[in-house]
């Protein structure tokens, strides 16, 4: 049997390998490439190559895999943003070949003192509004002034999502990944958040990546690149400060993380909540055209900024 393996490199096509393993589409496998070993993903199976061509063999199958929904999203992301599909895969699996065989302990998220918070009437109404769509794809905008408790509303929604063994992704502009947000998260959930951004160490990235693909990490708070991580059971995406211009990446792989988050939620068939004090022009137009649902909260919530 032959298999097409996509590599996380600047290629717009997969490579054909002989396969004696029982590999499925989405399996991460080790393959020879030039003089090195590389980690790639089985993209297609039972692919017949013309005879009389020397084809190398898949070395081994790893314990990791990505699902068809993510594969479809990668293909769409590549086409929509005009980026080689191998580069998109690199954003998903990173430098996996450098750490996939390292036996790390699971990431340990420090437990903290948990505080009790009660939603006020307006926040409770907003939560119920957001929950109307249950577990299907939906884009809802939660708008509120600073200090109105928008964060508490989506924390409550996340709490219900992860109780069903699902995962949640909270996207924030990197500048907002502050100690203040971390403290609020810890006060509500009783443990420190797993955080993904450009400045975390390679070891921390390795542990988080494995925790995400194994469904050991239930909530990830991250900058824009986090939206391409291989979540095992993603249940909701929150885009906080959706109006912030830093969601647009202008160098390297060019994309708008807010828009791509909405698209990923569509492929996953899960809800996405856009959180803002003042909606962006694009979001405002989608609200006006009834493509996005919209709710406002006004009252200041003094106990929880």
Language-model-derived ranges and their functions:
Residues 1-278, 282-284, 288-304:
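Accessory, non-ATPase domains that flank or precede helicase/AAA+ motor cores in DNA-metabolism machines
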């Amino acid at each position: 049997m032959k298999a097409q393996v996509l590599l996380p490199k600047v290629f717009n096509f997969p490579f054909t390998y002989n396969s004696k393993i029982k590999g499925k589409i989405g399996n991460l496998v080790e393959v020879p490439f030039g003089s090195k070993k590389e980690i790639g993903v089985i993209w297609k199976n039972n692919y017949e190559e013309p005879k009389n061509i020397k084809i190398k063999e898949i070395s081994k199958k790893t314990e990791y895999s990505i699902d068809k929904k993510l594969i479809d999203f990668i293909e769409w992301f590549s086409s929509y943003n005009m980026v080689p599909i191998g580069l998109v895969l690199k954003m998903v699996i990173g430098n996996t070949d450098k750490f996939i065989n390292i036996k790390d302990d699971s990431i340990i998220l420090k437990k903290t003192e948990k505080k009790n918070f009660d939603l006020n009437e307006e926040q409770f109404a907003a939560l119920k509004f957001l929950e109307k769509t249950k577990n299907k794809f939906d884009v809802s905008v939660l708008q509120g002034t600073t200090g109105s408790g928008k964060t508490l509303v989506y924390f409550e929604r996340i709490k219900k999502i992860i109780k069903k063994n699902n995962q949640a992704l909270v996207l924030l502009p990197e500048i907002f990944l502050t100690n203040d947000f971390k403290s609020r998260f810890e006060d509500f959930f009783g443990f420190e958040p797993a955080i993904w951004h450009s400045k975390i160490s390679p070891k921390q990235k390795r542990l988080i990546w494995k925790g995400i693909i194994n469904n050991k990490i239930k909530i990830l708070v991250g900058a824009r690149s986090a939206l391409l991580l291989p979540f095992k059971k993603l249940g909701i995406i929150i885009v906080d400060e959706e109006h912030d211009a830093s969601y647009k990446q202008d160098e390297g792989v060019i994309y708008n993380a807010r828009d791509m988050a909405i698209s990923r939620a569509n492929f996953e068939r899960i809800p996405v909540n856009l959180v803002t004090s003042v909606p962006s022009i694009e979001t405002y137009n989608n609200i006006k055209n009834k493509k996005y649902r919209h709710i406002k909260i006004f009252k200041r919530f003094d106990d929880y900024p």
